[in-house]
């Protein structure tokens, strides 16, 4: 049944959603898979670049816990020449809930919504087709199908980006749907049952997660380039989990750990890494920076990179000798020498 999600390649029906008009943008509801015996719809923001000559590349944007479909996120990609669709995969729209105490990250629901994220795979006791991860993955794949059906979009040049739990969804979808030209996951990953921290405590005895839903189980099938974006102080998704997951993927990988990035939705949008990665992959088919070789010579560590763009002449080594959960370790920055062969 999980593999069937990858067959949702036909464009879903969709309709305009109510709300104040925004120039160059559309609020929409797109049809998704049934839940509890009834049809569901997914709220989304859809936007195209204002200035374009012919079809443009595209990207599907997937929020994390406490998030929704973000108009601003779509606009940021539109400004860079991409068509974009940002989905709300928990049966919500982008209006904050008026109930006191629910202002922080809680959103008004709509009548066609599917399941909401409940705990850490907390609905694993439900039938597969009733679970949140099933519906979030389906909505993501269907959003890609919708975007690919638009004449303004290059159907074979559509990427995928997820933040936090949206990154988990992105990693899950990457292993099920081979159409994405690239995948960017901020924070979220697989190996949550064996990477330490709060997620391991919640999932180490969850047999369904360990044998079916952990993204790493099928990630070798994902041949598209992938970027994993995080930071050393990340408290939710262990860097051990992130590293393990990236090593399972079947295509070119790039990891970017940004000191003091912080965990949230805007933080990855405001960084250049995701945009540079997407542009490079669509231009060359590869990440712009790749590790070619690592070596140890006594107390000296050497890393060789292949890059298709100039590197900052300042280099530092960020390291730790601590044990335990990676987000709680003390990390040290040490100066490093950078020498290059011209790009």
Model-flagged regions — what are they?
Residues 4-54, 305-307, 337-339:
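N-terminal cap/lid segment of alpha/beta-hydrolase-fold proteins
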Residues 43, 54-64, 75, 84:
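Short beta-strand element of the alpha/beta-hydrolase
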Residues 75-137, 189-201:
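Cap/lid segment of the alpha/beta-hydrolase catalytic domain
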Residues 141-208:
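Primarily recognizes the serine-hydrolase "nucleophile elbow" in alpha/beta-hydrolase
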Residues 194-248:
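The feature captures the conserved acid-bearing segment of alpha/beta-hydrolase catalytic domains
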Residues 249-265:
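Catalytic histidine neighborhood in serine/cysteine hydrolases
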Residues 269, 276-319, 335-342:
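Surface beta-strand/loop "capping" patches
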